[in-house]
Regions:
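Cleavable N-terminal export/targeting peptides
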Residues: 1-29
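Intrinsically disordered, low-complexity peptide-like regions
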Residues: 3, 14, 146-148, 153, ...
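Transmembrane beta-barrel domains of Gram-negative outer membranes and organellar outer membranes
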Residues: 19-126, 130, 134-137, 171-173, ...
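A mid-sequence, solvent-exposed acidic-amphipathic segment
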Residues: 131-176
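Compositionally biased, intrinsically disordered low-complexity segments
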Residues: 8-9, 159-161, 213
Length: 217
């Protein structure tokens, strides 16, 4: 019984796991491989999470791939398909669908995640930009969730194909069933690699901290 309760809690936390860092509308590009992995912790309590995804570009607008979420006594595998297009410098739109399956329960279907990605530049030099992610998660045994992540970011170019991008934003539910949460962090770009330091729940006793890395080849 205790294990079942822990797994249900893990499923609840996994709804937010894939949406911690900002996702942009564009896909990886034709014939390219994108990978991302992260570790999430809450200092002071035993609640570690990992999230990993690999995506392969099919043309300039589509990508397909897999992902894996692990939490306390929980593990979920997902297959994804993604679409994205650039409408203009100021507005881009994309989306993603991910059915996920419980690796600890005979690979049974667990939940379906659907995402809408919007982003664009605010200034002509492309340094200041905005980004929103909307996640609709339909669970097999729990009520659905509908969350929104809204960020402002500023890109600071450095030397030798490097840059630093701090971002700040808020997380809220379109169902208005939870308080608005602050989120933010930065990523450091080195050529085709990004190193992430992120977090949310800053005003709680155990904030969530994320360290991640991604690449494109």
């Amino acid at each position: 019984m205790r294990k079942a309760i822990v797994c249900c809690l893990g499923l609840l936390f996994s709804m937010q796991a894939i949406a911690q860092i900002p996702y942009y509308a564009g896909t990886v590009g034709d014939g390219k491989l994108y990978g991302y992995t992260s570790l999430k912790v809450r200092p002071g309590i035993n609640r570690q999470e990992t999230y990993t995804t690999f995506q392969y570009g099919l043309g300039d607008h589509f990508a397909t791939g897999i992902d894996l979420y692990t939490g306390q006594n929980c593990a979920y595998w997902g297959a994804l398909i993604r679409y994205g297009t650039k409408v203009s410098q100021w507005f881009n739109i994309g989306g993603e669908i991910i059915p996920s399956f419980d690796l600890n329960n005979s690979f049974k279907f667990a939940y379906l995640s659907s995402a809408l990605y919007l982003n664009g530049d605010i200034t002509r030099d492309k340094r200041l930009f905005w980004c929103t992610n909307t996640w609709w998660v339909v669970n097999k045994e729990k009520p659905f969730t509908l969350s929104n992540y809204e960020y402002l970011g500023y890109n600071i170019p450095l030397k030798k194909q490097q840059s630093l991008t701090p971002m700040v934003g808020v997380i809220h539910s379109w169902l208005f069933d939870q308080d608005i949460d602050l989120a933010g962090g930065f990523y450091y770009t080195i050529k085709n690699w990004n190193l992430y330091v992120w977090g949310n729940d800053f005003l709680k006793s155990h904030p969530r901290l994320i360290a991640g890395i991604d690449f494109t080849f």
